Curated annotation (Swiss-Prot):
Molecular function GO labels: ribosome binding; RNA binding; translation elongation factor activity; translation initiation factor activity
UniProt function note: Functions by promoting the formation of the first peptide bond.
Gene symbol of the encoding locus: eIF5A
Main location: cytoplasm
Gene3D superfamilies: 2.30.30.30, Nucleic acid-binding proteins
HAMAP family, A to Z: eIF_5A (MF_00085)
Location of the protein in the cell: Cytoplasm
InterPro entries named among the record's database cross-references: IF5A-like (IPR001884), IF5A-like_N (IPR048670), NA-bd_OB-fold (IPR012340), Rib_uL2_dom2 (IPR014722), Trans_elong_IF5A_hypusine_site (IPR019769), Transl_elong_IF5A_arc (IPR022847), Transl_elong_IF5A_C (IPR020189), Translation_prot_SH3-like_sf (IPR008991)
Key words, A-Z: Cytoplasm, Hypusine, Initiation factor, Protein biosynthesis
Superkingdom, taxonomy of origin: Archaea
Protein name (Swiss-Prot/TrEMBL): Translation initiation factor 5A
Taxonomic classification: Archaea, Methanobacteriati, Methanobacteriota, Methanomada group, Methanococci
Amino acid sequence: MAGTKPGDLGGIKVGQYIVIDGIACKVMDYAHSKPGKHGGAKVRLVAVGIFEPVKKEHVGPASSRIDIPIIDKRKGQVLALMGDNVQLMDMESYETLEIPMPDDVEGIESGVEVEYFEAMDRYKITRVISK
């Protein structure tokens, strides 16, 4: 899977990012339990998708591996608003991107500087930096 690295399921904490069923998610709840004398510890995670508003759950042994998405946080400038999309220029590479307009970020207009991130070849605007 491109854009991911392996990690220990037992080492995951609330607020970290993981991949469940090919979807990059943020961990919202973590439960660690040891079932008994002869059983291995189990981990139960509840996570919410970064790009889709889906709730995912994963249960597995604490010693197992799970994919962790490589998230690249960057700054960009909004060039134009085009319906449901935002045309954005990366402030480091000057590359032009077309990203879906987020529902939860306010103040996006032409000329403002925003923070966005890339994970698994998808992009999302996270906040407005300056107006």
